[in-house]
């Protein structure tokens, strides 16, 4: 995890806020570093995590997590981490010859053209409370949910899935949901933009990573906007003024600073 980002969010590993839906967005940059932060943060905080990875392999996340001081393989073995490797599941679905395995595949809806109930059932079962567990709270992390749009899932079905996930994990289980949606500004993808806007109205916190309008800079890799509390306060998102920080990504951590106050500039 990135301690400076925890400080900006007022988060710590001793106590974890519950019932929160956090939306991660990016535009003209890659916001994946935010996913790695939350994955390592919740594991180090002692939460049980269900991670739905739709864009990268387990080894990719494991290598990054190792740099952040978290061993994903150990977390899986101990039952703290339930990892769905979407790339492998989708490959098995397309090229596998085992009908029984296809039925139990959480992504079987992609072939059947049905709703996302199999994936929801997987998430719900993975995070359901059970006797003897000592984890602080259940957490669902999805990276990147907009990939399902490109695989043919209608936006309304995807929004229904997210609604049920929030109702189950955040309300029923008193846990948290973190979801990444890549920006659609460059591609003009209307469905992706609809998904992002709809989820933004349902979230308590939005972290939005943006590329610099001035272009590439060696010492400043982008800026992060933090929107808070629009759902709980009843305000519209546009009425909520974001906190804005610039950042530089390094090998094992990310440095944040106020706009124009990079050490290279000063």
UniProtKB/Swiss-Prot annotation:
Alphabetical keyword list: Cytoplasm, Nucleus, tRNA processing
UniProt subcellular location: Cytoplasm; Nucleus
Self-association state and partner proteins as the record states: Component of the elongator complex.
Predominant location: cytoplasm
Keyword tRNA processing: yes
Family according to the record: Belongs to the ELP6 family.
Coiled coil feature spans: none
Known function: Component of the elongator complex which is required for multiple tRNA modifications, including mcm5U (5-methoxycarbonylmethyl uridine), mcm5s2U (5-methoxycarbonylmethyl-2-thiouridine), and ncm5U (5-carbamoylmethyl uridine). The elongator complex catalyzes formation of carboxymethyluridine in the wobble base at position 34 in tRNAs.
Name of this chain's protein: Elongator complex protein 6
């Amino acid at each position: 995890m990135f301690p400076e980002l925890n400080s900006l969010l007022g988060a710590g590993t001793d106590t974890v806020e519950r019932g929160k839906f956090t939306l991660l967005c990016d535009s003209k940059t890659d916001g994946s570093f935010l996913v790695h932060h939350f994955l390592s943060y919740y594991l180090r905080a002692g939460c049980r995590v269900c991670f739905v990875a739709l864009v990268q392999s387990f080894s990719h996340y494991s290598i990054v997590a190792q740099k952040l001081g978290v061993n994903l393989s150990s977390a899986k073995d101990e039952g703290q981490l339930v990892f769905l490797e979407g790339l492998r599941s989708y490959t098995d679905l397309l090229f596998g010859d085992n009908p029984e395995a296809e039925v139990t595949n959480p992504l079987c809806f992609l072939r059947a053209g049905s709703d996302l109930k199999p994936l929801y059932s997987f998430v719900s079962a993975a995070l359901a409370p059970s006797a003897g567990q000592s984890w602080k709270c259940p957490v669902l992390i999805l990276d990147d949910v907009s990939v399902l749009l490109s695989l043919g899932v209608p936006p309304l079905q995807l929004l229904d899935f997210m609604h049920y996930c929030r109702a189950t994990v955040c309300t029923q289980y008193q846990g948290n949901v973190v979801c990444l949606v890549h920006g659609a500004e460059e591609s003009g993808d209307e469905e992706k933009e609809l998904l992002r806007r709809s989820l933004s109205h349902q979230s308590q916190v939005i972290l939005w990573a943006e590329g610099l309008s001035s272009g590439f800079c060696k010492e400043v890799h982008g800026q992060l906007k933090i929107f808070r509390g629009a759902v709980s306060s009843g305000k519209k998102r546009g009425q909520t003024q974001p906190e804005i920080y610039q950042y530089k990504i390094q090998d094992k951590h990310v440095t944040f600073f106020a706009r124009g106050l990079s050490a290279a500039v000063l």
